[in-house]
Amino acid sequence: MKPTNILTYLDETATSYPDKPSFIGEASALTFLELKSNTEAIGSFIADKNIYNEPILVFMEKSPEEVSALLGVVRSGNFYVVLDLDMPEARLDAIIDITKAKLMIVDGHTKEKAKSLGFSGDICSYEEALSTQANDELLLDISHKAKETDTIYLVFTSGSTGVPKGVVASHRNVIDYIEGLGKVLECDENTVFGNQAPLYLDASLKDVYTTLKYGATTYFIPKKLFMSPVMLIEYLNEHKINTICFVSSALTIFTKLSAFDIAKPEYLKVVAFGGEVLPLSHLKQWMKACPGARFINLYGATECTGMSSYYVVYYVEKLENGIPIGKPLPDTEIFLIDEEGNIIANPHPSAEISSKDEESDHTVKQSAEMENLRHKGEICIGGTGLSSGYYKDEEITKAKFVNYQLTDGRSILLYKTGDIGYFGEDGELYFTGRGDNQIKHRGYRIELEEIEACGGAFEGVDRGCCIYNPEKEIITFFYEGRMEEGMVKENFRNRLASYMVPGKVVKLDKLPLMAGGKIDRKALSKLI
């Protein structure tokens, strides 16, 4: 039976594996029992301040201690919001303004920075919170009041207006996500994670909460090692790390610097990747270097608690159309809806779907004629992992989360991802690009990711990104690699329709990246 509170994982694991390491950083490590004790002390400290069901800011360096603080916030009946030194000051101030939090927990690395921010609440040190005597009676009372729909965290994503949006996630969202993901990754108490994602990103959930459920161990890989892939491989081998869930661009660092010519991961059993498309040329090199590992492509959105679908890669040679994003995780449903609101492909072929809201009243029907393979539509996700929306932003929540009524009697809430996809002849779901990266050029609709996928397959192109200038009507392909610009353009001419060939090709020493490792498209836009 599934728990209703995420802390049940920690409490049970601390009983089963009290002395086993849970999280290990550069300077410290915590056993499961130590982690549980820390959360009880920190939870009591916060609860003593009579703060309940409110956001608490945690501004610390990534470490086992930061995990203690996050879970301590949850133990107190509140929800956490992670701040990080990598965030620009304007973003930090925006999050502070949106949350109106009363308390911020800091450590020695962030204390001075915290004082310079526009925060009017209490700033307390991690050490002060940790020194509190656990109040068992108070914590028990809080746990009795807790509901599975209570918020556990806010993760802030970029907003189209430049103001970040806080995605709300509950205990039930995270529990159902971890229950399904753990089965896909085949986790158990012997799983050893190597964490890459910052804790302010939902991508870190795969490591943190799966560790709590299974009694696994997570190593926080030093950030500097991602600039030295051979040293990173040595780190993976030294600590016998057998499972990694990396953003795709992190995997390409190994291959573009030819790290596998010098060393190979010896213990990897699972290599999961997502966040952006992984070029097939890089996947082939990884599969050759780690022939005994399972490779899993994960797809999802922050608004759906991270990942919603998966595809296990067995034969990369057969992936002519790229890597599928596959099938839904348990307790998840995925629909494709076209521009007219019709379902293109549906796991419930006999269903009729109605969308009713204040703005519209239309009925969407599933029929055999609509099940047109490779007919593209917007990927819409439903299920228990679906967020309740954006924090204090009802307008955009209503726009992105749409309530549907199926004619079989079921009602379902769907998140409109803005991603475009299609169902292939193999029955798998394929991602082709963002709806907002779909352009109309010379009378044709073009998905920029389709051009990027083509360029990423060139031998000598490590990775690339397309930017479109609508005023000049020019597509620019920026890339890293050893292939010269003229040859890249010639390859495009040989492989793409003429209207899709980039008007400009620009070679860069290094593509600009965002904190999570994705390519920074806004930074590239400034170069055109």
Where are the model-predicted features located?
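ATP-dependent adenylate-forming carboxylate-activation enzymes
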Residues: 60-64, 78-94, 108-110, 216-239, ...
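AMP-dependent adenylate-forming
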Residues: 5-7, 104-117, 121-144, 174, ...
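Conserved AMP-binding/adenylation subdomain of ANL enzymes
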Residues: 165-194, 202-242
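AMP-binding/adenylate-forming domain of the ANL superfamily
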Residues: 1-154, 169, 176, 283, ...
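Conserved S/T- and glycine-rich ATP-binding loop of Class I adenylate-forming
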Residues: 56, 73, 104, 151, ...
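Conserved pre-ATP/AMP-binding loop-to-beta segment of ANL
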Residues: 138-156, 163, 187-193, 199
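Conserved AMP-binding
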Residues: 60-63, 84, 187, 197-204, ...
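Gly/Ser/Thr-rich phosphate-binding loop
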Residues: 213-216, 241-245, 255-324, 330-333, ...
